[in-house]
């Protein structure tokens, strides 16, 4: 598990991959939950829908993620539930994965934290 303060302090860290496992409209900020004061994603996050992770074997997951086994990944969603499933799959595939339990529900409430919206360049 990772807390907000640690994640916020590591934005831009090239050794950490932030993985948003929500739906694509949630990731881009086109749709979200009315309870959140803003929509979007954590800056620098990559998108990979949780259903894609849960349907694959370890080698398939590594191919989807595109990172070497052992890479450090933080997964988040809206409230930490989908990302908990994602972390389980990522760990089974050999990643050092942690769940940001507060997820977008917590991040979106902090006006002092940056957010991105729209399409994103996904690393290949």
Predicted regions and their residues:
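Rhodanese-like catalytic fold shared by cysteine-dependent sulfurtransferases
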Residues: 1-17, 21-124
């Amino acid at each position: 598990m990772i807390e907000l303060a640690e994640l916020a302090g590591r934005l831009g860290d090239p050794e950490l991959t932030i993985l948003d496992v929500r739906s694509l409209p949630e990731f881009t900020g086109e749709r979200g939950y009315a309870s959140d004061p803003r929509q979007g994603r954590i800056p620098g996050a990559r998108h990979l829908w949780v259903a894609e992770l849960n349907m694959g074997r370890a080698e398939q997951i590594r191919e989807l993620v595109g990172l070497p086994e052992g890479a450090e990944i933080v997964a988040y969603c809206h409230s930490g539930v989908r990302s908990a499933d994602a972390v389980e799959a990522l760990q089974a595939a050999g990643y050092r994965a942690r769940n940001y339990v507060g997820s977008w529900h917590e991040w979106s409430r902090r006006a002092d934290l940056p957010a991105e919206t729209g399409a994103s360049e996904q690393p290949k």
